[in-house]
Amino acid sequence: MKEYWEILRELREDRDLRQADIAAILGTTQQVYSRYEKGINELPVRHLKTLCMYYGVSADYVLSLNKDNKKR
């Protein structure tokens, strides 16, 4: 089972986006977002919600709670 930060990185890289691009969407800095993707800082729920809406995936998918629920 993948960690949520690994899934976030894959989602970002699959769309050829930079950490700075996602940080701007979240209203944070690239440095802070980098710490989320490395698993150093925990991702706030408000950011999880924003990213799920942006990527079109469920929170269950990002959190690896169920393999069959990529779509909301």
Model region roles, listed by residue range:
Residues 27, 47-61:
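DNA major-groove recognition helix of helix-turn-helix/homeodomain DNA-binding modules
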Residues 13, 27, 38-40, 67:
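Residue-level detection of the helix-turn-helix DNA-binding "recognition helix"
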Residues 7, 18, 44-47, 58:
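Residues that mark the N-terminal boundary/hinge immediately upstream of a DNA-recognition element
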